[in-house]
């Protein structure tokens, strides 16, 4: 196993960390309606918990309104309940087979809470990246002990690991700044 092999094994895990962070912050409310707000909503349907997307079409009607076109009319009440119980601060209303969700404007206090939450998710993701770097360095140390790579190769690998972590941490910082801007926009 070479330094390149170790890095190629760890880099996809770092990319997954970035993807998970993107998914995490997509569900944080901004002042605008987005279908990502409802990604985590689970509906009690047919005896099990199902993602909202599996019981209806989720769409954006306008900047402040989402809609869920429920496929099975008997599920409308369950969809309403699931959205209300998801602790998103949303109040859905049924209209035939459609559930409308109006997105209330965020208060200044709530905006600050969401910014803080975004930063917390970002910091958790950065810690995860550093853990991946630690794993990579541990792997390089092991290879050096087994005489599979030289000390120079190990040091070069550590520098590459640091560069990778720096690149992805910078990406996370940019994503936090973008999300903060979206949240604070009135």
Swiss-Prot record:
Locations listed in the record: Cytoplasm
InterPro entries: Ribosome_recyc_fac, Ribosome_recyc_fac_dom, RRF_sf
Domain of life: Bacteria
Stretches of the chain forming a coiled coil according to its record: none
GO BP term, example: cytoplasmic translational termination
Alphabetized CDD domains for the sequence: RRF
Entry keywords, A to Z: Cytoplasm, Protein biosynthesis
GO cellular component: cytosol
Molecular function as annotated in GO: ribosomal large subunit binding
Signal sequence extent: none
Function statement: Responsible for the release of ribosomes from messenger RNA at the termination of protein biosynthesis. May increase the efficiency of translation by recycling ribosomes from one round of translation to another.
UniProt family annotation: Belongs to the RRF family.
Protein name, as recorded: Ribosome-recycling factor
Organism, scientific name: Chlorobaculum parvum (strain DSM 263 / NCIMB 8327)
Gene: frr
